[in-house]
A protein has these predicted regions:
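Short, Lys/Arg- and Gly-enriched loop/turn segments at beta-strand edges
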Residues: 63-74
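A generic structural micro-feature
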Residues: 6-10, 26, 72-75, 83-85
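A structural micro-motif recognizing beta-strand termini
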Residues: 44-49, 96-98
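Generic short beta-strand segments
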Residues: 17-19, 59-65
């Protein structure tokens, strides 16, 4: 199967507070850890399933050490996105365009 991703993923585990919203109503808040992240999205392992169309607000906790790819911290603290895939391993979230981090483009 041909890889469809335009941008590489980095296997970086970041703490994320995930607020799930459906039809404008908050349905759940979870504290989770990413499995990987790219310029356009992230995969988050979870046993919780979400309905199609679920939107997310994400607050990432960034490590204090020198991760150069996260120098654009301001935009990362209040990121929004949408569910693009959900399976028994977790959820894939695509970031809204205003949440994309230039530092991750080069991975």
């Amino acid at each position: 199967m041909k890889e469809r991703r335009k941008y590489n993923r980095a296997g970086i585990q970041l703490h994320v507070r995930l607020e799930a919203v459906n039809a404008g109503r908050r349905i759940m808040v979870l504290d989770l850890t990413t499995r990987d992240i790219s310029y356009t999205g992230t995969f988050i392992p979870t046993l919780t399933s979400f309905p199609e169309g679920t939107r997310f607000r994400m607050d990432f906790t960034l490590p204090g050490d020198n991760l150069e790819e996260f120098r654009d911290i301001e935009s990362m603290m209040d990121c929004k996105g949408r569910l693009v895939r959900s399976d028994s391993h977790g959820i894939a979230i695509q970031f809204d365009e205003d949440c994309r981090f230039e530092g991750l483009k080069a991975l």
